[in-house]
Amino acid sequence: MASLIFTYAAMNAGKSASLLIAAHNYKERGMSVLVLKPAIDTRDSVCEVVSRIGIKQEANIITDDMDIFEFYKWAEAQKDIHCVFVDEAQFLKTEQVHQLSRIVDTYNVPVMAYGLRTDFAGKLFEGSKELLAIADKLIELKAVCHCGKKAIMTARLMEDGTPVKEGNQICIGDEIYVSLCRKHWNELTKKLG
């Protein structure tokens, strides 16, 4: 039985690398995969999933108004798809998460979504919130704080190291993101008042 799986972690835990390795395992066995990523993710490449360890793969772009279920039906008509992979799934819209679950339930094809759980302010992303609610299986990858403890939070810093307290939830640009344990994240956010 296929499942909708959400693999989540703070920044720099290897989410994209895990996705690319899992997709490679399918392809190595002669199976076809569908790799997707939201259009808003342009940091490393517009049309590829790129891992910080240097591996990458071409991806299909998801726009905010795209019906992923309909796109899957079109792609499936071209070739049998054995697994769907979604990088940066936190950026999905609620309805798009439900479209992923429809792929699982209608076609019995596994969907593996990877992303952040929370933003720099500790708030759930829309896509992550829905995935946490309806995924069949949740997997947490471990990121490491500078103190050596498990990092579950992400902080946003300006290039000069100044922490950011407020702002848009999604910001791809001059900011730097660091993974922190809850203790160090709380200490950082308290400094901001």
Curated annotation (Swiss-Prot):
Top-rank EC class of the record's enzyme: transferase
Annotated GO biological process: DNA biosynthetic process; thymidine metabolic process
Binding positions (ATP): A9, A10, M11, N12, A13, G14, K15, S16
Keywords assigned: ATP-binding, DNA synthesis, Kinase, Nucleotide-binding, Transferase
Documented EC number(s): 2.7.1.21
Keyword Nucleotide-binding: yes
Catalytic activity: thymidine + ATP = dTMP + ADP + H(+)
Keyword Transferase recorded: yes
UniProt-listed PROSITE patterns: TK_CELLULAR_TYPE (PS00603)
Transmembrane spans: none
One of the Pfam families matching this protein, by short name: TK
Top-level taxon of the source organism: Viruses
Molecular function, one GO term: ATP binding
PANTHER family: THYMIDINE KINASE, THYMIDINE KINASE, CYTOSOLIC
Membership in a protein family: Belongs to the thymidine kinase family.
Functional note: This thymidine kinase is one of the enzymes that catalyze DNA precursor synthesis. Although tk is a nonessential gene, some strains of host E.coli do not support the growth of phages that lack this gene.
NCBIfam families to which the protein is assigned, alphabetical: PRK04296.1-5 (NF003300)
The name this protein goes by in its record: Thymidine kinase
Originating species: Enterobacteria phage T4
Gene that this sequence comes from: TK
